[in-house]
Amino acid sequence: MPLFGWMKWPKNDSYKPTHYPGSDIVTKTLLRELKWHLKERERLIQEIENEQKVKKTGVDYNWLRNYQNPHTTIPVTEQRQLEVLCSQVQPCQTGTILSRFREVLAENDVLPWEIVYIFKQVLKDFLSSSDRGSEQEDLEDSGSMDCSAPSVIQGDSSKRADKDEIPTISSYVDKNTKDRFPVFSHRIWNLPYYHPSS
């Protein structure tokens, strides 16, 4: 008889609170995108390093290598936090989050180990802004549960009419990332990518 046979261990998926139908698909989609960006950024850095080695030595030995460099992986605790955040996203909001994430990556020279932090910040910013939007909808007693755009409050329309600029996703990202990512936008030099020994 096993020593701990009487204990009921939690199932693997017990840490994921599913808030919306289809949130498993959303979680898989968002995490697949994050892992793809990690691999692509790592591959790009590896290519740049190889080009610099070829320029320095004058000889290309890349065809001799048959081993794979260690890939940047997401720690398990970080992965679970991301899964919990992703499960709070409605399926119709996935495209908005992905476009914001891609835009932040395109505007900043980001290293592979910074990508997970940026993705988490984009998720948190989106969820906090959608929470504020849902509070406004609750005040107006709009009981719809679908993914419609948040309605405009009457007092806000006069403020928006004065603006010459049409609000876009990029302006939202610019406003919200100025104070959060000062290191990424003000980087002056690029250090070589470091592969930690295992």
UniProtKB/Swiss-Prot annotation:
<dbReference type="InterPro" id="IPR028092">
    <property type="entry name" value="RD3"/>
</dbReference>
<dbReference type="Pfam" id="PF14473">
    <property type="entry name" value="RD3"/>
</dbReference>
<feature type="coiled-coil region">
    <location>
        <begin position="28"/>
        <end position="57"/>
    </location>
</feature>
<feature type="compositionally biased region" description="Basic and acidic residues">
    <location>
        <begin position="157"/>
        <end position="166"/>
    </location>
</feature>
<feature type="region of interest" description="Disordered">
    <location>
        <begin position="133"/>
        <end position="168"/>
    </location>
</feature>
<protein>
    <recommendedName>
        <fullName>Protein RD3-like</fullName>
    </recommendedName>
</protein>
<keyword id="KW-0175">Coiled coil</keyword>
